[in-house]
Amino acid sequence: MLYPIFIFILAGLCEIGGGYLIWLWLREGQSSLVGLIGGAILMLYGVIATFQSFPSFGRVYAAYGGVFIIMSLIFAMVVDKQMPDKYDVIGAIICIVGVLVMLLPSRA
């Protein structure tokens, strides 16, 4: 179970990091090089996601969505200095429970 978690985290870092660099370029006036690097990192995210050991694309991406939510809230706390409120936390917990329900049962 550690390998899929590692891939989810690595994919999340690429998706959030790449998206943030594009945000900086388009919304905050950073150079186009920053946007280009962000785009390259987002492409890398798409490749990394294919390394998951689960056979179903839809299930992998649905489960990754829960991980992405948690990582986005952590990013907001660390980078944007925006603390999640109780509804953010409750929603994130519900998402993680959903991810576990989707990934933990063995399927024949």
From Swiss-Prot:
UniProt keywords, alphabetically: Cell membrane, Membrane, Transmembrane, Transmembrane helix
InterPro entries referenced in this protein's UniProt entry, alphabetically: UPF0060 (IPR003844)
Compartments, as annotated in UniProt: Cell membrane
Chain ranges passing through the membrane: 5-25, 31-51, 60-80, 86-106
Keyword Cell membrane among UniProt keywords: yes
Gene Ontology cellular component terms for the protein in this record: plasma membrane
Coarse class of the protein's main subcellular location: membrane
Domain of life (superkingdom): Bacteria
Record keyword Membrane present: yes
Pfam entry (one): UPF0060
Topology in the lipid bilayer: Multi-pass membrane protein
Family named by the database record: Belongs to the UPF0060 family.
NCBIfam families documented for this protein: PRK02237.1 (NF002586)
Protein name per its UniProtKB record: UPF0060 membrane protein SAOUHSC_02615
